Every structure is written in C-alpha cells, then in structure tokens.
From Swiss-Prot:
Lipid bilayer topology: Peripheral membrane protein
SUPFAM superfamilies: P-loop containing nucleoside triphosphate hydrolases (SSF52540)
PROSITE patterns: ABC_TRANSPORTER_1 (PS00211), ABC_TRANSPORTER_2 (PS50893)
Protein's name in the database: Arginine transport ATP-binding protein ArtP
Metal-binding found in the keyword field: no
Reaction(s) this enzyme catalyzes, per UniProt: a polar amino acid(out) + ATP + H2O = a polar amino acid(in) + ADP + phosphate + H(+); L-arginine(out) + ATP + H2O = L-arginine(in) + ADP + phosphate + H(+)
First-tier enzyme category under EC: translocase
Cellular component, GO annotation: plasma membrane
Annotated EC: 7.4.2.1
C-alpha cells in the first residue's frame, strides 16, 4: 500500500477543518481529490507530506509511518518523508534567481548528496522528457505559466519520489497547456509512481483518475474507482458532477 491514512483530524487553531479522514491508495494509483471550494482538498494533500500537521491519526506513505499526534518529534523522519513524497504547488515556487537547470539540481545536490555532473545529467534527461531542454538556461521570469508548471514537475521528479502530490496543477492554465500537463500525468502513470491530485476540473479528473475521493466540508463523502464518474453513489457527488 503506497498510502494509508487512518482517522486523520486537522485543526486550524480551534477550528476543525478535516474530520476523521480514512483513505488508501495502491502503488501506481492516481488519486484525484474533488470537491467544492472549502472542502479541505488542499489541506488534506498538504498533510500527506506534513506541510500541514494534523492533530491526530496515522499516516503511512511511501514506507514512512507517523503517529500524527506527535509527527514533528523526529525531524530526520520528516526530511526522509519529503524526499520520498514530492510536491508540485499551484504557484510553482521556483527560485527566481536560479536558471531552470539550477532549480532542478539544487535539492538533489544538497539533500541527496548527488554530484553536480550526475544532477545535471538527470536534469537534462527530465527536461527532454518534458520537452523543456531548450529552456535549461532561462530564468523563471522568462517562462510562461505552463512552462513554469512543467519545470516545477521536473524539479519534484529530480528527488526520485515514490509519491507525487499536485495541488491544482492546471489552475489558471489555458486548455492547450492543461492538455500537456494531463499528458505528463499519464506518462508518469506508466512509470508506476503514485500520484495524488487536487483539482476542481472534473474533465481533468476523468482523464487521469484511477481512484476518486469526493469531499465536502472537511469530510470524505464518496470514494471509489473511476467508475464513480459514470455511477456516483451519493446524491452530493451526483449533484457536483452535474454542474
């Protein structure tokens, strides 16, 4: 099992925003988190590599296990978690003062101890795969939103994660670039990596999901295979899909 979440509860201050979350994903699954704004999708995905720290529950992901009531007690374990579980943010978070290739090689050299030559070789292979090799020496400022998003995906893949998390990867991208990101997610499926994707775009979800998690108000309302799109089991999900 690549991901197992058990009885996860999350609070912002005194306000509870995730309630008793339970979910599992097999290796190679592409799990899509759907739901209206405020459902808790982005909070949930950020708990999967402890960017947000739950109050209670259990998390097992990419062979890292945490009792969430004291998850921050072991900084080394968290560092390992973040090597094994990559994250692609909605806002890209590229370092503006570094070129594309420098953005890619920074973490592998500092965190994994990879040599500069090896890191650059890996980076150029990834950039070719994502059709970005001609941008290697450009700065993020000179890239389009779609190019920045693909560079952000490449940067996350440089750490060779077992699980990759995407928070709204196609938000604010035009249809052509959205299609490119969908193609990348499909290509990654063939490598066996496990992916978790937050999106509000049902058509994107339908193209990539092997597993669907529908949320409202911090709770999982429906969970199942991609068949859920054709045969939703709950009125809430049926209503969501009809809009």
């Amino acid at each position: 099992m690549a991901i197992r979440v058990k009885n996860l509860n999350f609070f912002y201050g005194s306000s509870q925003t995730l309630f008793d979350i339970n979910l599992e994903a097999e290796e190679g699954d592409t799990v899509v988190l759907l739901g209206p704004s405020g459902a808790g999708k982005s909070t949930l995905i950020r708990t999967l590599n402890l960017l947000e720290v739950p109050k209670s529950g259990e998390l097992s992901i990419a062979n890292n296990e945490f009792n969430l009531s004291n998850a921050m007690a072991n900084p080394k374990a968290i560092q390992q978690l973040r090597q094994d579980v990559g994250m692609v943010f909605q806002q890209y978070h590229l370092w503006p003062h570094l070129t594309v290739i420098e953005n890619l090689i920074e973490a592998p050299m500092k965190v994994r101890g990879v040599s500069e030559n090896e890191a650059k070789t890996d980076a150029m292979e990834l950039l070719k795969r994502l059709r970005l090799e001609q941008l290697a020496d450009r700065f993020p400022l000179h890239l389009s939103g779609g190019q920045q998003q693909r560079v952000a995906i490449a940067r996350a893949l440089m750490m060779k994660p077992q699980v990759l998390l995407f928070d709204e990867p196609t938000a604010a991208l035009d249809p052509e670039i959205t299609a490119q990101v969908v193609d990348i997610i499909k290509e990654l499926q063939e490598t066996g990596i496990t992916q978790v994707i937050v999106t509000h775009e049902v058509n994107v979800a339908q193209k990539v999901a092997t597993k669907v998690v529908y949320m409202e108000q911090g709770k999982i309302v429906e969970m199942g295979s991609a068949d859920c799109f054709e045969n939703p089991k709950t009125e809430q999900f049926k209503h969501y899909l009809s809009h």
